[in-house]
């Protein structure tokens, strides 16, 4: 426990909060070619690679992912949620924050039903999370 005198000489430092999705907190000024500090809830990007990845131990699957070059020129790995997708190289996608616990290095999710990404077909429940329209009838 520090004394009052020690605290007067050297005050306590406040804890620095680290972002879970740092690429969303950076903007880009293409006119000046400089990165700016502008936070955004989502960002647009272009898929540079689409593939599958295997999760960490105890799980076993082929998880779909896309490598995305964002509008701020940062390249990130994003998870493609839902069953089946229509993404390929050069597809324009919208990403949001949110990691995938069993895929190391995947800190972002692709938003289904936005831009070039189609919603999940034949989805009856939890449709809003997968960009699925309300079924007729």
Swiss-Prot record:
Keyword Chloroplast (UniProt): no
3-methylthioaspartic acid modification, residue list: 102
Molecular function in Gene Ontology: rRNA binding; structural constituent of ribosome; tRNA binding
Region of interest (Disordered), ranges: 1-21, 34-57
Recorded coiled-coil stretches: none
GO terms under biological process: translation
Gene Ontology cellular component annotations, sorted alphabetically: small ribosomal subunit
Keyword set, alphabetical order: Methylation, Ribonucleoprotein, Ribosomal protein, RNA-binding, rRNA-binding, tRNA-binding
Superkingdom: Bacteria
Keyword NAD on entry: no
Annotated function: With S4 and S5 plays an important role in translational accuracy.
SUBUNIT field: Part of the 30S ribosomal subunit. Contacts proteins S8 and S17. May interact with IF1 in the 30S initiation complex.
Protein family membership: Belongs to the universal ribosomal protein uS12 family.
Name used for this protein in its record: Small ribosomal subunit protein uS12
């Amino acid at each position: 426990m520090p004394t009052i005198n020690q605290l007067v000489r050297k005050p306590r430092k406040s804890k620095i909060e680290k972002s879970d999705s740092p690429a969303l907190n950076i903007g880009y000024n293409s006119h000046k070619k400089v990165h700016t500090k502008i936070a955004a809830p989502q960002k647009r990007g272009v898929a540079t690679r689409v593939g599958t990845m295997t999760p960490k131990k105890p799980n076993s699957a082929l998880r779909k992912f896309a490598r995305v070059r964002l509008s701020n020129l940062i390249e990130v790995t994003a998870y493609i949620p839902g069953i089946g997708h229509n993404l390929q190289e050069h597809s324009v996608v919208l990403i949001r924050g949110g990691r995938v616990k069993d895929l190391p290095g995947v800190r972002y999710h692709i938003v289904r039903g936005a831009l070039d990404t189609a919603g999940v077909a034949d989805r009856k429940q939890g449709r809003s999370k997968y960009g699925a329209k309300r079924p007729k009838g």
